[in-house]
A protein has these predicted regions:
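PDZ-domain C-terminal substructure recognizer with occasional recognition of PDZ-binding tails
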Residues: 28-32, 40-42, 75, 95-135
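Serine endopeptidase catalytic core focused on the charge-relay Asp
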Residues: 124-288, 292, 301-302, 310, ...
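Short, small/polar residue-rich loop motifs at catalytic or cofactor-binding pockets
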Residues: 67, 291-294
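Conserved PDZ fold ligand-binding element
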Residues: 69-91, 299-302, 306-310
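PDZ/PDZ-like groove recognition
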Residues: 40-75
């Protein structure tokens, strides 16, 4: 979760510690009166559609140094979808396509800032005789976040999407959610966001990811996932006043921390429905307030789940935004 956005003041998306379109959806509270409360940390491994260009490189050839991708106008953050009509999802796909491609330029279909584009690249051979484009790609993203709730067989997390280099919602092909152990944190300070640090428990997959949208990252829980240790809770509407967040800053077990909801807006905002302020002395002394990795942490008021944390204010880590649970409930 590395993106910053402007909304009167600077805020930071809290999603994966490492990581616009508009959906016209409003959930009906009657569709699920009780769900299972999250608050526990999770490790995310998300696979993207296409190969994400993580870097550009020079290629040393017999004729000197060349930069085919850069010369063709490819940028870091672009997502390559096709080479000469062949679908690309990872570095191996690129390698195989280049091996079978005829001499000359190849056609590249890629996405930048949500728009599909086309260009031509002339591959070059390195000193080993291997065709290169001069790019580094990755096909997955991973990091730490927080589970908001489980509704039937569906798991809801983060409360915001995983974004690409240009702020667009990343298209995904799937992924895994694992249990996670929080091993430490970096305290947030004015002007600098803090973060949770943790490890994936790789042998403990809890869900398969199938959706990355405006309202968060969603999937289906594993068949062997035990919900008996979780707390059932009703969903409700928030109002200005005292509330709590249920989050984990050490180990695997979440705890309640005091906050105040200081502003609500569920009519005109899809995701920034609440402004919250941390008042819990213990949380302020440890993390400094809201930090990256808390994204998805449940907001509870009057014994009901009303939303999840999504952003921290860069200039004030005690404050942040939250999303209404009703925007997440049926995803």
């Amino acid at each position: 979760m590395k993106k910053t956005v402007k909304f009167l003041i600077l805020t930071l998306i809290l999603g994966l510690c490492c990581f616009t379109g508009k959906f016209s959806f409003y959930a009906n509270a009657e569709t699920a009166t009780k769900i299972y409360l999250g608050g526990f940390p999770a490790g995310f491994n998300i696979y993207t559609k296409g190969a994400f260009v993580a870097g550009l490189s020079d290629v040393i050839t017999e004729n000197g140094i060349e930069s085919p991708a850069k010369d063709a106008g490819i940028h870091v953050g672009d997502v390559i979808l096709y080479l000469n009509g062949a679908e690309i999802n990872n570095a191996k796909d690129i390698e195989n396509t280049l091996k079978t491609a005829k001499s000359g330029k190849i056609t590249v279909i890629y996405v930048r800032n949500g728009d599909e584009n086309s260009t031509e690249i002339l591959p070059v051979k390195d000193l080993s005789g291997i065709k290169r484009l001069g790019i580094f790609v990755r096909d997955n993203f991973n990091g730490i976040g927080t589970v908001t709730f489980i509704n039937g067989e569906r798991i809801a997390t983060l409360g915001h999407p995983i974004l690409g280099e240009y702020g667009e919602i990343m298209q995904i092909t799937g992924g895994e959610i694992y249990k996670s152990d929080i091993t430490g944190y970096v305290k947030g300070e004015r002007g600098t966001a803090g973060e949770l640090r943790g490890i994936f428990l790789k042998n403990q997959s809890i869900a398969k990811i199938d959706k990355n949208c405006l309202y968060g990252v969603f999937g289906n829980i594993a068949e062997n996932f035990d919900k008996s240790t979780l707390t059932e809770i009703e969903i409700g509407d928030a109002q200005i006043g005292c509330a709590s967040i249920f989050t984990t800053i050490d180990g695997t077990e979440p705890k309640m921390y005091d906050i105040s909801i200081v502003k609500t807006d569920t009519l005109f905002s899809d995701t920034k429905n609440y402004v919250i302020k941390v008042s819990d002395k213990g949380l302020l002394e440890t993390t400094g307030g809201i930090v990256q990795g808390m994204s998805g942490s449940p907001i509870i008021q009057n014994g009901k789940l009303v939303g999840a944390i999504t952003h921290v204010f860069i200039n004030d880590p005690t404050r942040g935004f939250g999303i209404s649970v009703k925007n997440m409930i049926n995803q």
